[in-house]
């Protein structure tokens, strides 16, 4: 049963933590010595009691400790670092004091929304600093002064270099969905940002998956971090059924999808493809067959992506076809089905994709289309995430 903030408490209690010895559990938000105005925002947001990761991580982060926090999708990771940032900033000082870096523009914008909601009684300023938007607006907002900035690495680094994002008051750097951020593409940009920050800046790393190479890399800019880690064999999603459908040829996937579309009763669904070109192709094919779908990928202008996301969040569109730009951390509570039209080549991305379904403890279904070429990837995914094979054959 999910509470008002959408956390599945039953699943939450089953999480196994491999944590640093000094970590204590705080069963209530009141026991964390949080500001009164922040507590009001937490309760107004719908939280009644902290989730497993919140009860362990918030106090450690508020103490100023470098922290690595790992927990599965839908367990309140975003609120964990948002509450912590709101606790440590001084709203009387209109300077940037906390910085969050995310791998996608949509996730950075969502984090801004969570911060503003939780900080509703604190008069907090928080800006989403993301690529694809008006640079002049960024400059205006940053020059005015923002307590918290949530952004993508490229635009944030640019604003720092232009001296519009002032870093001298920054106390905390949060790397959200750190596995993706620290992959090859973002690594150098993160270092670009980090070298401008004060030497004493606290670093918080948050993700559903933390492969060894990511943990290894964090040693370069973290000092004696507190670790709150979920065991790898616990990284499955409660209440989510996973299936594969064997399709002999790539060409057969489309007909299979049309059959599924006709027979399944769903609230909302996300269909993942591996390339932007495939997203466009599949969208056109579905529309030609008189199916109503929307689509989104990284080549689209940011305004168009924002509009598509808003329509999907509000339930105006039921089926979204997307690349992995949508796979990480985006919460739309009514998504009950994820279809991997293409299996992800990155096995970590599989957990992020299927985590879009059954958010916050609701029941969800993930369906994977598997050709003969995909069998190796499927086995790889099985070995990575599932203690014993439990895929059902369609």
From Swiss-Prot:
The short motif DEAD box is annotated over 176-179
Question: Would you identify the family this protein belongs to, as annotated?
Answer: Belongs to the DEAD box helicase family. DDX48/FAL1 subfamily.
Instruction: Select a single GO molecular function from the record's annotations and give it.
Output: RNA binding
| Gene Ontology cellular component annotations, sorted alphabetically | nucleolar chromatin
Q: Where does ATP bind?
A: 71-78
Q: Does the keyword RNA-binding apply?
A: yes
Task: List locations, semicolon-separated.
Answer: Nucleus, Nucleolus
Report the protein's function: ATP-dependent RNA helicase involved in 40S ribosomal subunit biogenesis. Required for the processing and cleavage of 35S pre-rRNA at sites A0, A1, and A2, leading to mature 18S rRNA.
Name of protein: ATP-dependent RNA helicase FAL1
Provide the top EC class: hydrolase
Please state the protein's primary subcellular location.
nucleus
Q: Alphabetically, which GO biological process terms does the record hold? A: rRNA processing
Q: Where is the Helicase ATP-binding domain?
A: 58-228
Q: Which UniProt keywords apply?
A: ATP-binding, Helicase, Hydrolase, Nucleotide-binding, Nucleus, Ribosome biogenesis, RNA-binding, rRNA processing
Cite the domain annotation text. Answer: The Q motif is unique to and characteristic of the DEAD box family of RNA helicases and controls ATP binding and hydrolysis.
- Catalytic activity, reaction form: ATP + H2O = ADP + phosphate + H(+)
Q: Where is this motif: Q motif?
A: 27-55
């Amino acid at each position: 049963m999910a509470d008002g903030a959408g956390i599945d408490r039953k699943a939450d209690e089953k999480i196994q933590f491999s944590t640093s010895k000094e970590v204590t559990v705080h069963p209530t938000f009141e026991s964390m010595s949080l500001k009164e105005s922040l507590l009001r925002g937490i309760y107004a947001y719908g939280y009644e009691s902290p989730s497993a990761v919140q009860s362990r991580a918030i106090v450690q982060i508020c103490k100023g400790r470098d922290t690595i926090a790992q927990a599965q999708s839908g367990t309140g990771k975003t609120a964990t670092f948002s509450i912590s940032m709101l606790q440590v900033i001084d709203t009387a000082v209109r300077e940037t004091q906390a910085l969050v870096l995310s791998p996608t523009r949509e996730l950075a914008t969502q984090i801004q929304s969570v911060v503003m909601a939780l900080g509703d009684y604190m008069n907090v300023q928080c800006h989403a600093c993301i690529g694809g938007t008006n640079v002049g607006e960024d400059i205006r907002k940053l020059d005015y002064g923002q307590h918290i900035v949530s952004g993508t690495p490229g635009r944030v680094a640019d604003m720092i270099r232009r001296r519009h994002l002032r870093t001298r008051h920054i106390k905390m750097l949060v790397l959200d969905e750190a596995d993706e951020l620290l992959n090859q593409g973002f690594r150098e940009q993160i270092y670009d940002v980090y070298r401008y920050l004060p030497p004493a800046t606290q670093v918080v790393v948050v993700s559903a998956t933390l492969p060894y190479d990511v943990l290894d890399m964090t040693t370069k800019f973290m000092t004696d971090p507190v670790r709150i880690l979920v065991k790898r064999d616990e990284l499955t999603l409660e209440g989510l059924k996973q299936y594969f459908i064997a399709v002999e040829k790539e060409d057969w996937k489309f007909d299979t999808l049309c059959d599924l579309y006709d027979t399944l009763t769903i609230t909302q669904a996300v269909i993942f493809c591996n390339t932007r070109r495939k997203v466009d192709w599949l969208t056109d094919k579905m529309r030609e067959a008189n199916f109503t779908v929307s689509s989104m990928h990284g080549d689209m202008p940011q305004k168009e992506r924002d509009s598509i996301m808003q329509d999907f969040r509000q339930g105006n569109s039921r089926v979204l076809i997307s690349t992995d730009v949508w796979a990480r951390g985006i919460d739309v509570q009514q998504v009950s089905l994820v279809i991997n039209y293409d299996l992800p080549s990155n096995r970590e991305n599989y957990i992020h994709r299927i985590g879009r379904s059954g958010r916050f403890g609701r029941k969800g279904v993930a369906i994977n289309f598997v050709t003969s070429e995909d069998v190796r990837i499927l086995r790889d995914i099985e070995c990575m995430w599932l203690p014993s094979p439990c895929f059902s054959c369609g």
